[in-house]
Amino acid sequence: MSAELETIEHQLEDSITSLRNNGVRITPQRQAILKFLIASHTHPTADEIYQALSPDFPNISVATIYNNLRVFKDIGIVKELPYGDSSSRFDFSTHNHYHVICEQCGKIVDFHYPQLDEVEQLAQHVTDFNVTHHRMEIYGLCKDCQDK
């Protein structure tokens, strides 16, 4: 088993444990949606998840996808990214990171820069806020759009 596949399986197991600890029943569809999100590096929309899973789950609906994404979001294992167009994208991530977003095609790429975590501490110190989180987006043109 490859290291990436082991990581996906480990994250899936941890997420299923979190869901169960919150009283959520694990269905085959719910598990498939979660596994797709964990393995995806594209920050998919609900429609993209539906397109990917509907061949294996012919009875799945877009509403089922949205309902499960809401459950995952409420528990904190998925983040909704309401960037750009009217379709939110969804991100499975268990660590802090930022997003670089293509202004032309909407592609979102993860960007890790741990030094920015200090921003929260400084903001809290300077403002006396109890800082809970922060979000940063960087915009530009991805390589594919530059080459067009």
Curated annotation (Swiss-Prot):
CDD domains: Fur_like. Residues 1-84 are annotated as: DNA-binding. It is found in: Cytoplasm. InterPro entries: FUR (IPR002481), Fur_C (IPR043135), WH-like_DNA-bd_sf (IPR036388), WH_DNA-bd_sf (IPR036390). One of its GO terms (biological process) is negative regulation of DNA-templated transcription. It comes from the Bacteria. GO terms for molecular function: DNA-binding transcription factor activity; transcription cis-regulatory region binding; zinc ion binding. Zn(2+) binds at residues 102, 105, 142, 145. Its main location: cytoplasm. Keywords: Cytoplasm, DNA-binding, Manganese, Metal-binding, Repressor, Transcription, Transcription regulation, Zinc. Disulfide bonds: none annotated. GO terms for cellular component: cytoplasm. Transmembrane segments: none annotated. Belongs to the Fur family. Manganese-dependent repressor that controls a regulon of oxidative stress resistance and iron-storage proteins. May act as a hydrogen peroxide and organic hydroperoxide sensor. This is Peroxide-responsive repressor PerR.
